Every structure is written in structure tokens, then in C-alpha cells.
């Protein structure tokens, strides 16, 4: 199954510029690189269309997509939906070698409404940025309400390993059909093996609108543009600092930066 699907899976590398502020108010800019995965869902107007997570590509200065043959090409964002954590990026076929075009393939979509717990599941993606990897497991639960930083999402839960870099990759059934888009892994000292994916039936109408460059929601999710660390009472005591949230980074051009 995985061998047949590999031509549909890509790696996505983004370059990001962030600004951070020291305790003394000094602002510094730095460039970082992030990696994720994507799934080839079609071709339109000479462009290869790829779905991934919004958090993989949001605010990227530039994007590069790596294909199954190891070749890569620059990509641009076609549309994003931060509420659904989905994005469609495109690669101009003019920037791709003919040999690569012959080796890639469009993924086959499944029907996530027919899933049952205990069913086999396969996760494919660019785990840890090391290239394509395959992990197997089962559908652990359906319609899980998962609380993320700024939203609640209804997701598929699986014990197939979803590691950093797998975001935007494929969750497949035993037929090799796309049933979900890997998005997050729950990790703690007490819990292992809890990965989550956006059901493909939830994603399809949103993806179609993104391809057409149509608005996907009436209003965007409120967005501040900072990353921080929660300082709980034990950390506050250890480091002799107040409890609360310590702002570590302010994203360039975000509402937080514009507000000063």
C-alpha cells in the first residue's frame, strides 16, 4: 500500500523570519527553517496542487516542495484556512523536471464517514525532516474533540506514530485511500501514541474552496502573533519569577508586532 502512495506524498520546507524581544526591550530578527509534509491532490492550470496544514506554511517567506524522486521545486501558497488548519500550495510544472512529473501521482480520496474504531491506519509523511517514512497502527477513536492553542477541532485519533514533520501528511486506510490529514500529536510523560488527523470528509469542501481561491469562513480566527511559555507555580518558584505567560517571540507583521 505505502509503495503505491509514496508518489503522492511530498516534503515541505519553509523559511521563516521571526522577531524576538529580550527582557530589556531589544528586538532581534532571525531566520529559521521548518519542515512538514503534503499530499498531491490534483493538477490545475499547469500547477501541481498540494494540501497540507496551515501551520506548516503560515508566514513562510519561501517554500520548497520535495518529491518522491528526491527532486525539489519552489512552491507558493494558493489558499489557507487557519480555523481548519488547512492550506493548499502549488508548484508550477514549468519548474519541475519531466522525469519528476512522470513519477508523481494524485492521491485517491477515501470516505472518512465509513471509518470504524479498530480499523487499520497508515501514516506517511516527512517525519522529523528525514524524508518519507511510514508508520502503522489503528483508528483509536472518531470525532475526538481536541483542544488546541486557540481552537477546538473534531479529529480522528490514531496510534500510528505522527512525529514532528508529519504534519500535513497522509493518514490512509488499508486500501491506500486518504482518510485524514495528519495534524498533531499529543505527547506527555504519561501518554504516548495519540496522534490526530483531520477527517478527509471535513477537509474536502474546504480544500475545494482553497483551490478556487474562495473564502472559507466569514471571519478569520482571532490571531495575535506571539509564541510563549506558560510559567506555572512550580516554575515561578524555581526561577523566582511571576506566574503567567512569558512571551518568547513576536511574529513579524503580526497584530502583536503592529500594536507594539
Model segments located where?
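Serine-dependent protease modules
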Residues: 1-235, 242-243, 252
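Conserved PDZ fold ligand-binding element
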Residues: 50, 256-260
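A structural signal for short secondary-structure junctions
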Residues: 239-241, 260
Amino acid at each position: 500500500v505505502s509503495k503505491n502512495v509514496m508518489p503522492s506524498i511530498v516534503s515541505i520546507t519553509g523559511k521563516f523570519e521571526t522577531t524576538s524581544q529580550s527582557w530589556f526591550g531589544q528586538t532581534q530578527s532571525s531566520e529559521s527553517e521548518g519542515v512538514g509534509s503534503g499530499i498531491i491532490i490534483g493538477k490545475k492550470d499547469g500547477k501541481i496542487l498540494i494540501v497540507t496544514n496551515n501551520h506548516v506554511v503560515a508566514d513562510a517567506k519561501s517554500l520548497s516542495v520535495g518529491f518522491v524522486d528526491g527532486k525539489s521545486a519552489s512552491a507558493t501558497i494558493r489558499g489557507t484556512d487557519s480555523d481548519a488548519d488547512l492550506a493548499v500550495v502549488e508548484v508550477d510544472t514549468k519548474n519541475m523536471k519531466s522525469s519528476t512529473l512522470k513519477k508523481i501521482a494524485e492521491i485517491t480520496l477515501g470516505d472518512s464517514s465509513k471509518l470504524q474504531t479498530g480499523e487499520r491506519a497508515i501514516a506517511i509523511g516527512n517525519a522529523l525532516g528525514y524524508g518519507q517514512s511510514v508508520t502503522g497502527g489503528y483508528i483509536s477513536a472518531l470525532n475526538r474533540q481536541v483542544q488546541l492553542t486557540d481552537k477546538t477541532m473534531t479529529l480522528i485519533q490514531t496510534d500510528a506514530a505522527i512525529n514532528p514533520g508529519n504534519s500535513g501528511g497522509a493518514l490512509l486506510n488499508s486500501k491506500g485511500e486518504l482518510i485524514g490529514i495528519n495534524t498533531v500529536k499529543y505527547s506527555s510523560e504519561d501518554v504516548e501514541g495519540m496522534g490526530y488527523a483531520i477527517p478527509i470528509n471535513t477537509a474536502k469542501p474546504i480544500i475545494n474552496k482553497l483551490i478556487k481561491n474562495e473564502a472559507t469562513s466569514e471571519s478569520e480566527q482571532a490571531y495575535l502573533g506571539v509564541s510563549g511559555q506558560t510559567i506555572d507555580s512550580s516554575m515561578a518558584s524555581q526561577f523566582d519569577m511571576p506566574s503567567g505567560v512569558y512571551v518568547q517571540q513576536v511574529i513579524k507583521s503580526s497584530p502583536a508586532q503592529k500594536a507594539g
